[in-house]
Amino acid sequence: MKNNSVVLTESLSIPEKLSYFNEDDKNDYEILAKKFREKKIKHIVTVARGTSDCAALFVSYMFAKCLGITTYSLPPSLITLENANFDFNNTLVIIITQSGLSQDLIACESAVKAMGAETLVITNNLKSELINSGTYFYNINAGEERSVAATKTFVLTLAIIIKLMSTILLKKNVLINLLELPNLLQKEIDNNWDHEIIEKKISSGFIISRGIGFALSNEIALKFKELCQEQIEPYSSAEVMHGPKSLIDNTFKIFTLSLNDNSGSVVIKDTNEIKQKTKHLYEITSNSHLDTRLLFTKNKFSELDPLTIMTKFYPWIIKYSLAKGMDPDTPRYLSKVTKTF
């Protein structure tokens, strides 16, 4: 097994990177928070691809849930291929791009501003032209991410969104707990999941969740494809019941992710039904008695649980990839900057 994996090193650095981010954060959350409180922003539109699009799904659900704002994920092709026009007055378009170099996202940012939108650019690249063109800019500040597979930038993007939402809602206790979180994350990594409990011979299945957890399940599914060449598909546990559950048997492996919020109890209920259909079931949860449980320590504020889950997940999936004899530093056919338009 490879011992000097770049992506593993980066994933293990997440607690340290979050601590540094907290200490050095110069992002102006209050300027946007004030606009939201004054109801000057009526709609949220996100534009992103890959792992950043999984973060955008997190954005969409959180803003809709917490603020009652309509949210929409804009396919870049509507701008770059179809030349579609929209009325984006009173709309904040959030562009999330770790590299800051995707030409389709750069084109979208310019186009939506011409349609009346204000834009928030969230990137890890201080040399990106988007920094100067965006109405607002938030720095992910994760340090250089050398690996093809994004890890630390995803977690810090979620932290940015949680900080913005907590500032809007004046949840000072969440912000205080976020400052203390790196210590907990380090303990969680030091007591991480056992990758050896996963059935390596099965390469297809589902990752099932609801609510905010569904955004995480999309990123988890992407990493199974990217690093392990396994076709694990993300589903809402409700949508699974509308047809896909017909696929489930002992040739499938199922991961379920339940958070400590309103969605969690529903996922647990659906998990109990799925248990009867396959012996390859793995629960990502803070409370389970299964031998195949993947436990995380719940936070005082459930808003922070996604950071804990993903901080544990990344080193675990990378070690699983290595155990399968793969090289997670060089995912097949992939490169750091994907050129699409």
Model-derived features: where do they sit?
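Active-site phosphate/pyrophosphate-binding segments
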Residues: 2-42, 136-140, 144-253, 263, ...
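Tryptophan-centered motif/residue detector
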Residues: 18, 58-61, 193, 313
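Phosphate-moiety recognition in structured ligand-binding domains
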Residues: 2-8, 20, 134, 159, ...
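Glycine-rich phosphate-binding loops that contact phosphosugars or nucleotide phosphates
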Residues: 30, 37-183, 190-191, 210, ...
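A broad, structural surface signal
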Residues: 9, 16, 23, 56-57, ...
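Catalytic-loop motifs flanking and including active-site residues across diverse enzymes
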Residues: 55, 59, 156-161, 216, ...
